[in-house]
Amino acid sequence: MLSKTNQNIFTVSRLNAEVRLLLENEMGIVWLVGEISNFSAPVSGHWYLTLKDSRAQVKCAMFRGNNRRVTFKPANGNQVLVKARLSLYEPRGDYQLIIESMQPEGDGRLQQEFEELKMKLAAEGLFAQTNKLPLPEHPKRVGIITSKTGAALYDILDVLKRRDPSLPVVIYPTMVQGDDAAIQIAQAIGRANSRNECDVLIVGRGGGSLEDLWCFNNEILARTIAASQIPIISAVGHEVDMTIADFVADVRAPTPSAAAELVSRDNSHKDQSLVAKQHKLASAMRYYLSQQKQQSAQLLHRLERQHPSYQLQRQSQQLDELDMRLRRAMQRFIDTRQQAVERKHHRLQLNSPVKHLAQQKSRLERVEHKLLDTMDRKLLTMRHQLAIAAEKLDTVSPLATLKRGYSITQTEQGKVVTSADDVKTGDLLVTRLANGEIHSTVS
């Protein structure tokens, strides 16, 4: 037998609490892709679901404060990518995920890859302002790396022609979209560095979707930009579009036209140096804010685990669980009572007076029909027997004898005369024949 003094004995509640803290503190944030099933959204506003693949599944909860930011309506069968933290639902001891963000799998995978590469390169210092090259105050030749048929090239050339038409330009045509685009752009940067004919490079294209701009989130391209000995201005998409190339480049311009303004002198009144410094400062501020945002997110995550709202979330989940259990119990009770009522109704129908009377009426009709059939058969038999008896009676009937030529003589009083001694002279006699009778007087 184990000695209690030598053992760390847990209660079930304490064990579950310890495991929950271990999962939440040690595992941190995880990214997970899977198919939604058992999705439910009770009145509390929280979401409960199961994420599964072909071999396993895990229960998940997404509380109201987080699911408000989801831009689509989840449904069973959806493939999604979620950002979540591991936890344990203590009352049942169920391991679960607390989802913080959710995206459809396609967009989510790209965004996840973007975030992972961004964190990796930031940790290596590729975004650090100290590693960035300054732009030349008065460029002697500008290199443009973009598609030779894209609108971005013509936007850049239009701005340069308007602001500084004497500025020489070298175009390095390349693909800016598709699977091979990142390698081609990196090769163009390498070619420009080896020729060393330009003192600033503009790398960019027009706006597009996340997939369209994805080549600018390539790690090889990012490292090529960081290694360039010629300052590079990233001018990808619109102002709201941010790529890895924007973070690595020496300066980020919100549009290709803005990049052209950075490298050209406005001969009328614009101070190119001031504009460049403004953009450089803006780039540094964006990098600083990005770093602060990451640190704030980490601090917020720690604070959330200790915040009363976190406890409220867990208690709210317990209330939702109790609510669902109560609803199921009420439904089972209602179903049981309904079945009992149906059974009693069925028994009542079996013993119903109306049904009983109908059965008796049917039985009476059968008896009546049977009685009538019996009477008909009996009457037919009796008629047949009567006919036979009548036939026999006819054979011994006096009328039959009369028909054979015989006659019957009776006195006036109706006495049959069988001997001459039965009459005397003067008696009136009636002789019956087969057809009629004869009246005579004895003489």
Swiss-Prot record:
Molecular functions (GO terms): exodeoxyribonuclease VII activity; nucleic acid binding
Location of the protein in the cell: Cytoplasm
Record flagged with keyword DNA repair: no
Alphabetized UniProt keyword annotations: Cytoplasm, Exonuclease, Hydrolase, Nuclease
GO-annotated biological processes: DNA catabolic process
A Pfam family per the record: Exonuc_VII_L
Keyword Cytoplasm: yes
Family of this protein: Belongs to the XseA family.
Protein name as it appears in the record: Exodeoxyribonuclease 7 large subunit
Organism, as annotated: Vibrio parahaemolyticus serotype O3:K6 (strain RIMD 2210633)
